[in-house]
Design a protein with these regions (language model features):
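Short, conserved acidic/polar surface loops in the N-terminal third of protein domains
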Residues: 64-67, 76, 139-143
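Short, surface-exposed linear segments at secondary-structure transitions and domain or protein termini
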Residues: 71-84
Length: 340
């Protein structure tokens, strides 16, 4: 992602915010450690990639199975869906917590070296904002079924608190390394705990304290945070003010989200920076260049009032997006970018 983004920036001339993965798979599933033997296998079954991760401990074997669409040309960037979770019950989690290894020096060095490389490659073309280990709720839901998590918070309070604190500590320790890196800011995924999944009271009681624990590490280290929720978020606006984040992306409108840029601008004012809002799923891909240019101009005129806005699409470009539409997007945004 880093090198492709820099090359694209040089070709199309836009302000760059790179969103590369430093560790797409967490360190504890990349390789084996003492009492933690990892086997990672990817195979094609019935037209799908199936990724199976097995972890053998002295007590029992944990297993995670994920699937994604098969494409013989690509492997990176595939969105895998979990079919079997590493931690299926409280017994599994106790094993996970007991034997999950600590980082080694090589893991720390990898993050720090990645920051140096990003700094050198990007230069004055923009800033780097890699994905760290993830938002706490997102990370927990990678290894524990989110349906169980929703219920655990209400019916198994001690168990829920135990695993959320465990994952919060993992993310916080990850953030401590990023604070010492040359990356300009840090990305946190917060799209699982979205406004379509839960209400504001639930979020503030069962999600916010753990996210804030990890966010505070970055705040104390003066490292800006981009918090990602590309879905519904309107009911969570009050909670987002309490998160302590620097930037919230992506302000997605219907049908992907329920946000309206003008309303979000009015609500947040200068409490945080808004990032995104242009529909790349349908409009950028399907509209004419003229329509794209006008929409980009209009969105920029709305977003730039009072500052605290970064114009962008609401997520990555879809396969099949016409290059002429991307160029039209940039023309429209540039035409409205000046303050006069």
């Amino acid at each position: 992602r880093l090198f492709d983004a820099v090359a694209l920036r040089k070709e199309l001339d836009f302000d760059l915010v790179t969103r590369q993965y430093v560790n797409e798979i967490p360190y504890f599933l990349q390789r084996s450690f003492t009492n933690w033997e990892v086997e990672n296998k990817v195979e094609v079954v019935n037209g799908n990639y199936i990724r199976t991760i097995k972890v053998k401990t002295p007590v029992k074997e944990l297993r995670q199975v994920e699937g994604g669409p098969y494409n013989e040309k690509i492997m990176n960037g595939i969105q895998f869906r979990t079919m079997e979770y590493l931690s299926k019950d409280q017994d599994d989690f106790e094993v996970f917590k007991k034997y999950c290894p600590r980082r080694e020096k090589r893991d720390v060095d990898h993050i720090l070296e990645s920051g140096k490389i990003a700094k050198k490659e990007i230069g004055d073309l923009g800033i780097s904002c890699p994905w760290a280990m993830g938002g706490v709720y997102n990370l927990a839901s990678t290894y524990i079924n989110v349906q169980d998590m929703m219920v655990d918070a209400l019916s198994e309070e001690d168990y829920y608190e135990d695993y959320m604190n465990f994952f919060a500590d993992l993310v916080a320790s990850d953030h401590e390394i990023f604070v010492d890196s040359q990356f300009d800011c840090v990305g946190m995924q917060g799209n699982i705990a979205n406004g379509g999944m839960m209400g504001p009271d639930y979020f503030e009681e069962y999600v916010l304290p753990y996210e804030r624990k990890a966010i505070d590490v970055l705040r104390q280290g003066k490292k800006p945070i981009i918090y990602h929720n590309c879905g519904k978020a309107r009911v969570l606006y009050p909670a987002y003010k309490k998160l302590g984040i620097t930037v919230w992306e992506t302000i997605s409108e219907a049908p992907q989200g329920d946000n309206v840029l003008a309303e979000a601008k009015e609500y947040f004012k200068d409490d945080l920076i808004l990032f995104g809002n242009f529909d790349q799923v349908h409009f950028l891909k399907e509209a004419t260049p003229e329509e794209v240019e006008k929409r980009a101009y209009d969105l920029m005129m709305t977003g730039k009032k009072g500052g605290h806005y970064i114009f962008a699409c609401s997520d990555y470009l879809e396969i099949g997006t016409p290059l002429e539409n991307v160029k039209a997007l940039l023309r429209g945004a540039r035409a409205a970018s000046r303050y006069e």
